[in-house]
Amino acid sequence: MCIRDRSKAPLYVREAYECKKFAFVSDYVRLYALYSEGGIYLDTDVIVKKSFDNYLNNGFFSSIEYHKDMVKSLGIIKNDLNKDYTRKEYVEHIRGIGIQSAIFGGEKGNEFLKCCLDFYKDKVFIMQDGSYYDKVILPDILALCAEKYGFKYIEGQQSLGANVNIYPQEIFTGIKNATDNSVAIHCAHNSWRNKSFLQKTSIFLSQYSWGNKLKKILDIIGVR
């Protein structure tokens, strides 16, 4: 599968490509691949712990991505969500709550995947002031499109329309939230970000128990 002619891709994707912001191109391409061919998408830094067989009957599947510290510190539940955990109309997207985009699968031609692709149709990557439209990323886009099928911004399993199933965070998850129930774990190296040497060092240290004390020092001096 490939998009053979870049000129046929949405303007957002073409502009992101020209700006060499390839992570944002990848967001679209992974959706396009699953919609066109079906299958399971994994980032390159994902560890698969268990079989995906139990999830193959879904039209689309992934997990909730819920950053509870961010949600709490920003007052997201009070300020940005309705009482039924749907997004308030004036809020562009919900910070700290989305759908896991490093691990997901879908059937060829699934209407939810088509909805996600359509999100890009009227978007540009380069704004009028020269800045990039990069604040709304794929976990946000998946969540925004899932709203049409009944998605709510709350932890726990959700069975939605179009045979979309969103599982609890621990099933397809980041390394900090991994449990014995996890099927696949995203190590979240964030290779798409521009990192300083100290930031890269901090990430390296975090992989080893002996590096925890040194990493804490880096955290104190502002390296995240």
Regions found by a protein language model. Name each.
Residues 28-39:
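Small-residue hinge/turn detector
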